[in-house]
């Protein structure tokens, strides 16, 4: 059975790259009828940020990425916070020491800094590995008695992995194919820290094994760690999961990985939900009015393509189509305009009733009381030009309040010498129209235009100016029907008194 995990660290807001990693894990699990786990990797207590864990959970919930096991959904592999699994890791570190795959290292920070400086003076780069480990203070260079004495008196130590010397390691990645590396170029990574906590590397491998993870799908930034992780599985005598390293999400312009600073600089969110740090709230996609399904659709196509020209996919369709082998190796450029396009598409797909409920909240905040049926009709007329629900007010405020000014360029272009006469005659036509609906109103005005031999441009633009204040908006007669006879006539009289 397929089992995958999303394993973020609670060191701040969940970045959009992390969201995509969670999404691809979720899609892969559901495609294969498997389980999607959430594990919180909080081994680095110095970087722990209060509230970050709950933020991660809230973000996944908002996006509809429901996990089968994890924090708050305890399964048989609980607990799912690494800080709560602390006693577990020491025994596995000891196992590696006992079977010769790891060793105690007692080097102080000062001693390591001195070794680095000496290497740099020779023009070399210091690496703690097969070439240098026997010259440093560790259980490989010290006698057994010296090591026991140091451990007994409580000397600070870390546990390092004993990287094999001069081995050409061949690994398989589901996205990148075969990856080869010479272990001589790798360092002896710390697996267990002096504070009694494991590093990411040890905890990650132990937990993935114990939780029976079958596929590790993570960001490209973890590709350099793959050799160590493969070798750790070998050292423990365990079957390694399949690995897949996702391409980076790149800046909209320029080189490099998308960062929080890019969002701030260019004015778009990079977090799923609003996040407050140092007293400053950074807007997320949720807070900016994006629909979760629009963000999901957008992220799914960042680095993956189903092999056709379609772009709009429901979650069920994404699950059905998703294939890790179709994920690209190259980085995917983040396009803030494209996600707006997706949001526009999903806004059009929503019912007028659903959008009206959201819009009515804004109207209530403005102390505007309108029947829900009327709000629905207004939404149906304006949503085609909207990207966000927040756009509705600017697109529709003339339904709720008369224009306070008129577009000067439009007035100059459309308000002719005979326009006041035409407007007065239209007022009379509207006053005499008994059936005050869009169809009847349009027919009455068209009959008037034919009788007077007037063109569209002589009548409709001035009429729109009077009602809206500018030459934009929905069908004029739909506007007239919704604002009503009394308000329509008032606005026509107002523009006559305003423009002399």
Task: Mark where each language-model region is.
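Glycine- and acidic
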Residues: 5-10, 38-42, 211-216, 277-282, ...
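Active-site cores that bind ATP or allylic diphosphates and position pyrophosphate for catalysis
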Residues: 104, 108-262, 269, 281, ...
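Structural motif
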Residues: 285-293, 329-335, 369-378, 450-458, ...
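Small-residue-rich helix-loop
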Residues: 352-452
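Conserved phosphate-binding loops in nucleotide/dinucleotide-binding enzymes
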Residues: 79-83, 106, 192-193, 211-222, ...
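Charged substrate- and nucleic-acid-binding regions of tRNA-handling and nucleotidyl-transfer enzymes
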Residues: 438-499
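N-terminal Rossmann-like or analogous alpha/beta NTP/dinucleotide-binding catalytic cores
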Residues: 1-124, 224-235, 294
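Residue-level signal for inorganic ion chemistry
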Residues: 25, 56, 96, 100, ...
């Amino acid at each position: 059975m397929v089992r995958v995990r999303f394993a973020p660290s609670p060191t701040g807001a969940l970045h959009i790259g992390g969201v995509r990693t969670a999404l691809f894990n979720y899609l892969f699990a559901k495609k294969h009828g498997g389980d999607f786990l959430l594990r919180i990797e909080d081994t680095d207590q110095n970087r722990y940020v209060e509230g970050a864990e709950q933020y991660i959970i809230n973000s996944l919930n908002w996006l509809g990425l429901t996990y089968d096991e994890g924090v708050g959904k305890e399964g048989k592999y609980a607990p799912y916070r690494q800080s709560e699994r602390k006693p577990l890791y020491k025994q596995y570190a000891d196992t590696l020491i006992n079977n010769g795959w790891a060793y105690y290292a007692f080097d102080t920070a000062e001693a390591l800094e001195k070794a680095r400086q000496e290497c740099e003076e020779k023009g070399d780069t210091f690496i703690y590995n097969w070439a240098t480990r026997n010259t440093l203070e560790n259980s490989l260079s010290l006698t057994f008695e010296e090591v026991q004495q140091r451990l007994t008196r409580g000397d600070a130590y870390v546990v390092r992995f004993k990287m094999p010397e001069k081995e050409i390691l061949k690994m398989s990645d589901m996205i990148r194919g075969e990856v080869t590396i010479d272990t001589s170029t790798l360092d002896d990574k710390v697996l267990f820290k002096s504070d009694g906590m494991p590093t990411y590397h040890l905890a990650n491998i132990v937990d993935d094994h114990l939780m029976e993870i079958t596929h590790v799908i993570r960001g490209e930034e973890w590709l350099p760690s793959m050799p160590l992780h493969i070798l750790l599985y070998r050292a423990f005598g365990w079957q390694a999961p399949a690995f897949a390293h996702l391409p980076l999400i790149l800046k909209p312009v320029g080189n490099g990985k998308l960062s929080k600073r890019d969002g701030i600089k260019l004015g778009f969110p990079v977090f799923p939900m609003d996040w407050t740090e140092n007293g400053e709230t950074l807007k997320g996609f949720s807070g900016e009015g994006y629909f979760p399904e629009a963000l999901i659709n957008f992220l799914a196509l960042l680095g993956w393509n189903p092999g056709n020209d379609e772009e709009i996919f429901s979650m069920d369709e994404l699950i059905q189509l998703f294939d890790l082998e179709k994920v690209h190796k190259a980085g995917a450029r983040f396009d803030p305009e494209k996600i707006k396009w997706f949001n526009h598409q999903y806004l059009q797909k929503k019912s007028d009733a659903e959008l009206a409920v959201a819009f009515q909240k804004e109207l209530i905040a403005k102390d505007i009381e309108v029947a829900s049926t009327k709000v629905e009709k207004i939404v149906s007329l304006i949503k085609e030009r909207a990207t966000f629900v927040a756009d509705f007010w600017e697109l529709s405020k003339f339904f709720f309040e008369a224009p306070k000014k008129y577009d000067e360029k439009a007035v100059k272009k459309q308000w002719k010498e005979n326009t006041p006469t035409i407007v007065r005659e239209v007022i009379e036509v509207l006053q005499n129209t008994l059936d005050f609906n869009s169809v009847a109103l349009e027919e009455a005005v068209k009959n008037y235009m034919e009788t007077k031999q007037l063109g569209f441009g002589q009548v409709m633009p001035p009429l729109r100016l009077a009602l809206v204040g500018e030459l934009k908006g929905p069908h004029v007669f739909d506007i007239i029907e919704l604002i009503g006879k009394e308000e329509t006539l008032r606005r026509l009289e107002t523009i006559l008194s305003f423009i002399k």
